[in-house]
Each structure stands twice: as C-alpha cells, then as structure tokens.
Amino acid sequence: MSEYSVFTSESVSEGHPDKIADQISDAVLDAIIAKDKYARVACETLVKTGVAIIAGEVTTSAWVDLEELVRKVIIDIGYDSSDVGFDGATCGVLNIIGKQSVDINQGVDRAKPEDQGAGDQGLMFGYASNETDVLMPAPICFSHRLVERQAEARKSGLLPWLRPDAKSQVTCRYEGGKVVGIDAVVLSTQHNPEVSYNDLRDGVMELIIKQVLPAELLHKDTQFHINPTGNFVIGGPVGDCGLTGRKIIVDSYGGMARHGGGAFSGKDPSKVDRSAAYAGRYVAKNIVAAGLAERCEIQVSYAIGVAQPTSISINTFGTGKVSDEKIVQLVREHFDLRPYAITKMLDLLHPMYQPTAAYGHFGRHPFELTVDGDTFTAFTWEKTDKAALLRDAAGL
C-alpha cells in the first residue's frame, strides 16, 4: 500500500440501474440452477424507462416463469410504483434468451467431469488485504457499507423520503500501508420531491454516514458531499439505462486490485470469469489470513476448452513472509484451480448468486440459505478454512 497516500473507491445501491440488471441476471441464474444444477446460463439484462429486457444463452431442461421473476426482483428492490419512476408490476418484460452455442459446449463438457474445460479464455484476479476485518481494502468496504445502510434506512422507514437509487464514494488516507483517516465521503441518494435539502443532509449524515464509518477515522478536515447537486428525484432506470456487468470494479476490489475484465452476474460456474475470480479471492484471503502476507494479489488464466490454468502468479507487494515463488508453489499444492474442481471446492452448484449482485461479491460473511429444501452456504469463497494448513506448510 506504500505506493498510495490516499485511495478512493465507490459503490452503488441495489436500486442503481446497473445493479437492477445484475440482480435480475443472477435471479434468472438462481431460478434455473435451483431446478437444474448443471444448466448452462449466460443472462444479460437491460433496464430503461418502462421496460426490462433479458437476453443471452441458456441450456437447461428446467422451465421458469422468467417474466414473473423479473417483475418480483424489480418490486423487491423498491421500484413498485410510477411515483418512483419505475414499476415492476406494469413495466414491459421482453425475453430474448436463446440456447448456448454447441461449439462452446463441446469445449466445456467432458466424459470425465474433472476434465471439464474452461468456458472461455481469460484472466482473473483475486485479492486480499489485512486492512479491514473482512480482509478487503477499506475504501470499497466503507463504500459498500454506506449504500447498504441507505437501503436499510429506506426499507425500514427510518428515512421514509429515500428512494432506491444511490451512490457512495470514500477516500481513505494511508500511512505505512495502514488506513489512518477518511479524507472525503460522497453520498448521493435518490429522494422524494417533498423533503428539504437540510433534512436530507442531516438525516444522511446522522443516520447513514455516522452509523457506518468509524468515528476514529473521521477528522476535522474530512469533506462530506451529500447530494452535491442538491436534487436527486429522478433516478433508477428513468434517469439512466442499466446493463448487466457495468459495475465490475464495484463488484470486486474498488480499483485497488487489477481486474481481468469479465463480469460476474448472470453466469453459471462453468464460466471462469466468475468461478475463477471467486477462487482467486478464496486463495488470496487464505494467504493473508494465514499470515503469509499482508496483501496478496493472484492472477489465474485459462484457455477455452482446457482444464488446467495456463498460468498462476502471485504478488504480495513486498509484504510476504515467504517469497512469492514459494506461495505459488503452495497454491499449486493446496488449491485445484481447474473449473470443475473450483465448483466442487466452493460448492457453487446452488442458487446462491442473487445476494452477490449488490454490495460486492467479496468481503461478505458466509451464511446458510435454504431454497426449495436445498440447504447450502453462500459466499463460500470468503471462508478462511485453509489458512492454518497454508501457515504450517510455509513453516511459519
């Protein structure tokens, strides 16, 4: 972290247009794999004034009422009336989903499951840092918590004038790789037209910002920008078109780590854009939890139709207790990063994906879910169950 004295990350709420699209795409994925866990799903969503469009490629034996599903997601987020500019009950829903290409499918499916090839070529990154309790960079962690709190205050009625769309941004100051202060906070939230700016500013400051950000990191020179344009009544899909996969930095590490470019939402685990990025987080988090490094970034790459990664590399930015080369060796010994093995290691063939589509795919706490009698753990890639093994293997 020594290369930065300050660093900024942003997040967006579940009511942001791009996040509506992500949540719809993952709801479609969940609904299908709940009935057919080996389905192939690639679902993209577009939302704009009065309409939601789902497109992509799916291969499955399951039937799902996708129109009803799309409407439910939109309404559950909070777009349930024309008064807020978008109504899941009355918007148009267009379904143009087709079948997966047989050319792609023949590169993925194998007689032996463990030989399953990657669904595409690509490079994926995983990252962890010991600067927060969830081993995530502080700026993105705090940014997520702000918009998550905004949704809580809206849905509970604590701040009844809030509407679903919101964005946050946090600038942290670092000394010696440690967070020592928060220099700037931006929170823009959609609201109804009746609330005064003074009431909005005071409510957001007292009941959102001060409830989330550590008081010891705020100081007399911290800048607070609350709805800096003054008015944010028009929002959601009316204000901006929303598309799946347009918030990949929000979804990952807030820019602190590199990104391979592939989005996550709407993709089943055979797509390494998603599953290998989750595995990368799992590896990096266990390395940091084991005390092998204070920061760790892993890159994994794949060729379409090939099971074994084409490369694995590690960067601990000079914080490693052992060499990066030694850590690569440990990763190869203790983590099987073939696509099928990742799916087994992280138990990914369950309908766990819609919760990932807002407030970050990483830095979350694993929890149990039950869907149609199927009980499983979500966010398995956040476990640190291999930390002790890695520490012993490294001789620490």
From Swiss-Prot:
Residues 100-110 are annotated as: Flexible loop. Pfam families: S-AdoMet_synt_C (PF02773), S-AdoMet_synt_M (PF02772), S-AdoMet_synt_N (PF00438). PROSITE patterns: ADOMET_SYNTHASE_1, ADOMET_SYNTHASE_2. L-methionine binds at residues 57, 100, 240, 271. Its main location: cytoplasm. It catalyses: L-methionine + ATP + H2O = S-adenosyl-L-methionine + phosphate + diphosphate. One of its GO terms (cellular component) is cytosol. Belongs to the AdoMet synthase family. NCBIfam families: metK (TIGR01034). This is S-adenosylmethionine synthase. It comes from Pseudomonas aeruginosa (strain ATCC 15692 / DSM 22644 / CIP 104116 / JCM 14847 / LMG 12228 / 1C / PRS 101 / PAO1).
